[in-house]
Regions:
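Phosphate-group recognition and catalysis centered on beta-loop-alpha active-site segments
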Residues: 1-159
């Protein structure tokens, strides 16, 4: 059986944070799943919901804030509010974390509610920049997004 750490080690640590991913890497897992959105300034950011209020202390949509503004929101899980590894991070931060690890990364493109312009291309470009094509699975509840991914890169694995 192949086990993925859903949103990192989210049972114990704040979901979709660098801390949750770092702790997941200590486990006997096949891969990590995460969710990606785009900030107002076009950065690929790691967070599950379109709105920040469930996981961070703040209000509003991810798309309405720049990455620097998003970094100012504190995690709302008790005991982790002041941990820098529990802030909204960039996809490239996770790539730097896993690039030398024997791990698969499932990137869920979150554009089923908000249609982020060119998010598929931006994700694929970053994957190529880091030479991580063999470690990546792309998923989405938006079937058109998966079709777009395959059109842009027929070799990338989708699920």
């Amino acid at each position: 059986m192949k086990v993925f750490a859903h949103r990192g080690f989210s049972y114990k640590y704040p979901e979709n944070t660098l801390l949750a991913f770092k702790e997941a890497l200590k486990l006997d897992i096949y891969g990590i799943e995460l969710d990606v959105h785009k900030s107002k300034d076009g950065k690929l950011v790691i967070i599950h919901d379109e709105d920040i209020k469930r996981t961070f202390k703040g209000e509003g949509k991810v798309k309405d804030y720049t990455f620097e503004e998003l970094r100012n929101f504190k995690c709302n899980k008790e005991g982790f509010e002041n941990n820098d590894d529990c802030k909204i991070s960039l996809l490239e931060d996770v790539f730097n974390l896993i690039k030398d690890k024997d791990i698969v990364l499932n990137i869920e493109i979150k554009n089923d509610v908000i249609d982020y312009e060119n998010i598929e291309k931006d994700v694929l470009d970053l994957i190529k920049e880091y030479n991580l094509e063999r470690k990546i699975l792309i998923s989405s509840f938006n079937h058109k997004a998966l079709e777009k991914v395959k059109k842009l890169n027929g070799d990338i694995r989708i699920c």
